[in-house]
Amino acid sequence: MTHAFTHINADGNAHMVDVTDKSVTEREARAEAYIEMASETLEMIMSGSHHKGDVFATARIAGIQAAKKTSDLIPLCHPLMLTKVEVELEAQPEHNRVWIRSLCKLSGKTGVEMEALTAASTAALTIYDMCKAVQKDMVISQVRLTEKRGGKSGHFKV
């Protein structure tokens, strides 16, 4: 790997990358996360019997909100005008987990990878928050970028 860190300047200090001269292109990123839990906890979510309400709806909205607030959370991220944010949650009872997938899109000068990752991880954290009274040992895992399109570095897919 010969690439340099783009967020470190010649003096070794962190800085926000200057995207002034970059071209506006269509950009898209997808990310995923999993949250593992006891079968009883997952059943409570799936049946809608959780005392805090609809866990999936709340996690979906939290993920969307988080994508829009990424630059407030991660210091060197640019504020972006996202044109689409999607968060999908799928119960996987055979694995005692929820699979979370996110999609972020825009036409702009910088990518949306961090927004997609923030959406997926925040949705997982929201599920944890809503279910922690029932189960404290849930595990959030495999938060990762699964696909990226647009920009100079081109297409990436796991």
Curated annotation (Swiss-Prot):
Q: What reaction gets catalysed by this protein? A: (8S)-3',8-cyclo-7,8-dihydroguanosine 5'-triphosphate = cyclic pyranopterin phosphate + diphosphate
Q: Report the domain of life of the source organism.
A: Bacteria
Annotated GO biological process:
Mo-molybdopterin cofactor biosynthetic process
| Catalytic residue list | D129
Q: What Pfam families does its record include? A: MoaC (PF01967)
Is Lyase a UniProt keyword of this protein?
A: yes
Q: In which pathway does it act?
A: Cofactor biosynthesis; molybdopterin biosynthesis
- Keyword set, alphabetical order: Lyase, Molybdenum cofactor biosynthesis
- Enzyme Commission numbers on file: 4.6.1.17
InterPro entries of this UniProt entry?
A: MoaC (IPR023045), MoaC_bact/euk (IPR047594), MoaC_sf (IPR036522), MoCo_biosynth_MoaA/MoaC (IPR050105), Mopterin_CF_biosynth-C_dom (IPR002820)
Which is one GO molecular function term here? Answer: cyclic pyranopterin monophosphate synthase activity
Broadest EC class? lyase
PANTHER family annotated for this entry? MOLYBDENUM COFACTOR BIOSYNTHESIS PROTEIN 1, MOLYBDOPTERIN COFACTOR SYNTHESIS PROTEIN A
Task: Spell out the subunit comment.
Answer: Homohexamer; trimer of dimers.
Concerning its family, UniProt says: Belongs to the MoaC family.
Stated role: Catalyzes the conversion of (8S)-3',8-cyclo-7,8-dihydroguanosine 5'-triphosphate to cyclic pyranopterin monophosphate (cPMP).
Q: What is this protein called?
A: Cyclic pyranopterin monophosphate synthase
Look up and give the organism this protein is from: Shewanella halifaxensis (strain HAW-EB4)
Q: What is the lineage of its organism?
A: Bacteria, Pseudomonadati, Pseudomonadota, Gammaproteobacteria, Alteromonadales
